[in-house]
Amino acid sequence: LFLGDNGGDAPLGDERGYGSSAPLRGKKGTEFEGGMRVPFIAAWAKPEKKSKVQKNLPIEVGSMQTQLGTIMDIYPTVLSVAGCEVPQNYVIDGFDLKKQLSGKVDKKRPESFLMHFPHAHRGSYFTTYRMGDWKLIYYYLPETPKQPKALLYNLKDDPEERNELSSAHPDKCREMIQEMSAQLEKEGALYPVDKQGNELKPFVYF
């Protein structure tokens, strides 16, 4: 398995512009796709038709998978291929990739992804939430009064995040903020605090 856990971090270009992870926007630690979308290659080092393990995970040679996957999926996938049983009270955040690596679509997998930075990282306190083709970026402490608290992109039409759509699709933006908030509460997430120590939870502001 060959993959990265984050985007490039070379000192090239603006952190939130187009540089080390081009054509994607941003770099390691940022809220944009260049900070979180990475290549992922899976292959058997030596394909063997008689191998029981390889029969348990038949990787489709030369196929390309477009369904969502995350680095958290590696652990449950390895457990599944190895035939390990997970205790019922043991929480695993990822999903088994066996069906996706065999070239199929896993219809049971939710098409959502949450990345949460309640602490300062490259100057921002933010959460990104993806649901299908849509991606929301929510800022808890905007760096300037003019900076919006939420950005909305359609990654299918605009993977480079050049066309911000929160004003054009306010209903979708509200829906995304609500879905993101529900997911954060479900995970028991921590939140940033203001100078008075008050917790800053997301809210629908338009």
PLM features: what roles do these ranges have?
Residues 3-4:
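Generic enzyme active-site microenvironment
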Residues 34:
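Ligand-binding/active-site lining segments
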Residues 37-38:
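Catalytic cores of eukaryotic secretory-pathway lumenal/extracellular enzymes that build
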